[in-house]
Amino acid sequence: MIQVTYYREHCRVTVEGHAHSAEPGHDLVCAGVSALAYTLAANVGNLEDGGKVRFAYARLDPGNAEIGCTPKGKNAALVGCILNAVCVGFEMLARQYPEYISYEIHG
């Protein structure tokens, strides 16, 4: 099972585990989670390149990802919007496939 956790106050998302909903290469739940994680990582990188965050990081390994950043000043709302938008996708997957993915929000 994949566990996605959104730490709202820390602008951080972790993704752990594997869905095992189909054979490797044919697992649509895994593909959906991976697409969202990579989208979030790219957006955090763009925020860093644009000077909107002080610090950004993304570690994307099979079955284990962590993505986060520290917003600069007035950019906290923008960063929150981006994180929330991607996390809606994780939440939708968890509702559709509760046997393969769980989603939690902290903070």
Predicted regions and their residues:
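Short, conserved glycine- and acidic-residue-centered signature motifs
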Residues: V29-V33
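N-terminal intrinsically disordered, cationic/polar leader segments
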Residues: M1-L28, Y38, A42-G107
